[in-house]
Amino acid sequence: MNQDEYNSKFEVNDKESKLLKDAFNQVSDIRKFEIELYWKRAAYFWALIAVAFAGYFSILASEHMPSKFFLSLIVSCIGFVFTFAWFLSSRGSKYWQENWENHLDLLENNVTGPLYKTLLERPGHINMAEKLITGPLSVSVSKINQWVSVFIVFAWCLFNN
């Protein structure tokens, strides 16, 4: 669908359009829902991965466990699968969140004005400590999670050696 078709289907250029306002509200709610689901999924995977780590290290710490190395291999493979699933889930969640944010960008002008497109920042940092440590920083929390999951995937791979 091109921009003109989109604008026509959602009556983007009509400030009084009920369809436009309803679409904007629904898209806004879906975006919030996607973000909520992202964190629920992340917490779910964190719990599974933490259990896998605990199981892995408790197996290795056991002195008299038969098939100790085989069991640790099985648990580390399970941990790898959960971690890789977390990575893919994070990427998929980010995809859908950005989809709804793009809809908001297209719909918002005649509903709220360019609210989602407008970025307000502090005029400056007070000192170097605030700039480097305590001040705000434009980073993606979901990308941090993705990098952490990649690191943990490599950790599971190392545990298998």
Show which residues each predicted segment covers.
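A hydrophobic membrane-anchoring alpha-helix module
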Residues: P123-N161
